[in-house]
Structure formats: structure tokens, C-alpha cells
Amino acid sequence: MTKRPSPTGEYAVGTFTYTVNTNRDDALAPGHKRNIPARVYYPVLKESVADLTMAKYMTENMAIGLKKTMHVPVNFKKADAEGDNFSECYENAPKIEGKKFPLIMFNHGLLSFREGNSFLCIELASKGYVVISVGHPYDAVCTEFDDGTYVFAMKGIQNKQYEPMLGGFFNAYKLIKYNGDNRELAEKFEELQQNYCAFVRSRISEWEKDTMNAIDYAKENLSDMIDFEPGIAACGHSLGGATAYMLCFDKPEIVCGINIDGAPFGENHGRIQEKPFLQISCTGNLKAETRVFIDHKAPAYSVVFRDMAHVGFSDMKHMIKFNSLTGKLDADLMHENLCNCFTEFFDTYLKNTKEKPDIQSNDVITVTEYAPDAE
């Protein structure tokens, strides 16, 4: 856990957690109700944290979950003993009295965890946003609740991406090799998800409900720090990004969204997107992610990163050195460009302080804006 980026905004960052106890039956844990943990990152004055200790980055249970499910070698005991297990934020730091900030909802990817994209969330909070990262029990490598309990991922979940697995992988490979325009590729992906991805599709609606449970809590309990007037932004990595795309269809209070390298699973075929949306991709996954660029009334953007792999868009880029998982691109370059995409987009479509996001192609990213193509 040695290398981590520091936030660059005008604010320091506070953090705390909450758990929503719902009455929803949990399909992944029969006989149990689904409880939703969330972590809040929020702007605080830098002088208010001068004497505070930084929050822990990871618990031992989370390290066990990463190793157990994803085989990620996190030496928790060594990092903790050497003082390297910290996050660039402060537990329960004093809120800024009389100041409210717009809300961004973040959803992690399947078999990630609530703090798995914390570097991005912390940067956004330092730029004047409240960010709530939602945990998804049994879908994450480990999910921790405020009463001290925790659950690991559902057994065998890593084998349910495609059903049957062999046929799904074969057809996903055919999609990546297929040469077609954005609409043709989107239709090929729709065939793939309908024929082989029933489990993954079923999780989208549950994750939407998880997100709305977390939002309802925030509306009831955090209105002193959150400005709900401009609406709410949704974003996420992988399946969390697909959830953000569906939230933009389904929930009026969600006004814009960003998907980090997530294929657009969900019941979106033939629907018209009316919210501004940004799709971030690595080159290897772009052909599975073209749905965002068709059937939209609002601006749609594509940002494609060179030399990146899927897992590298999370904190893991700074923690492990497996190029096949995280890509060859320098971790700091990835983080800088990713954060710029987010701040430019949300400053435009959530804060409404800009006319248009200033996201330019460079030697790391290729940017395309798609004009609305639907009435």
C-alpha cells in the first residue's frame, strides 16, 4: 500500500460510514434482509484536521477477502505495522458549518469493495463534492457494517459472469473481434447479455435499489452538508458504472453519470438516454461499451485510456504491479487524467459552473463527443 495520490483540491477530506437496514429480501442470502453500508467522503477545512489522525485504508477482513476471492496479495499486517495502512482522509472530521456541497453517488465493481476507488472519491471531495460510496453485500470481496459484522463474497460468484461460462467467454471474444459501428456493436453486446449474463443483469436492479436506499438515508440525515438542489450524479467502476447508466434512465433525481470501463448491463435496449453521460474505457473493452454513444438526447462522451486494463481504474493501480490486470500506464498519469475527466464533467453537469467539460485528447486519453442522435 506504499504509493497513494494526495488530494489536490482546496479542501481536506473527512469520512464516516453508515448502514441502512432495509426490509428487502436478499437474493444472495436467502432468509436475510439486505443491509447497505455506505462511506461518505466530504470536504472539510484543512486547518480543522491539523491535529487529527488519518483514517485507516483497509481492515484485515478486507485484505482476507481480496486474497480469498481475487487472489490479490495484500500484506495487511506489514502495512499496518509500518504505518502504511492509511487513507488521505480523516474520520469524523468537523463539517464546515453552513456549507453544503453537491452529491456524487459511487458504486464499486463486482468483486471490488466500498473503498476500492477511494483515491478518486477523496480527490472529488477535495474539489467540493460530497461522495457516497455504496457497498454491495455478497457482491463485494468483503462488506463491513457499522455494528462490526462483515460478510465475504457469495461463494462461486466469480464463476457467474457468464452462464454457461465457456459459451459466454467465446461470444465475448467474438464481440471484441467484431468490426462494426457503435450501433452494431451495441446490438452484439445486447445478444451477449441476454443469452449469457442473466445473473449479472439481475444484480443491476438490486444495486440501483442499494443506491437509492443510501440516497434516502442521506436525504433524511445529511441535508446539513449536501446540496440536493442541482440533483445527484451517479458513477461507478465496472458493474457500478453500468448501475450509474441505468440510474440515469430510471431515477429523475439523477442528472448525469459516468461509467468507468463497465459494459452496459441492464434493461436499456431501445431506451433513450436523456442525461449527459461519460463512458471511460480501456481499448480492450471499448467494443463492449458503445451503447452509451447511441440513442441519447443529451451529450455523450467517450474517453479511451491507452495502456490500461480493467482493474487498473481502481486503487489497485497503485497497489499491485500486475500489468495484465492493471495495465502498463503509469499509476499517477492514470489518476491525474481520470480525476480531470470527473471534475470537468461534474463541474459542468452537476455544479453547473461550466458550459462544457474541458477534456482534451492527449498522449494518455482519446476523447470523443457524440452529439445527440434522438429526438
Regions of interest found by a model, annotated:
Residues Y42, F106-L110, S238, C282:
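Glycine-rich His-Gly loop
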Residues V255-D315:
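The feature captures the conserved acid-bearing segment of alpha/beta-hydrolase catalytic domains
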Residues T2-P5, E10, N23, P252, ...:
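Alpha/beta-hydrolase-fold serine-hydrolase catalytic core, especially in secreted/extracellular enzymes
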Residues N213-I272:
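Primarily recognizes the serine-hydrolase "nucleophile elbow" in alpha/beta-hydrolase
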Residues M1-I104:
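Domain-level recognition of soluble alpha/beta enzyme cores
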Residues D80-E144, G266, N285-K287:
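Short substrate-entry loop that stabilizes the transition state in hydrolases
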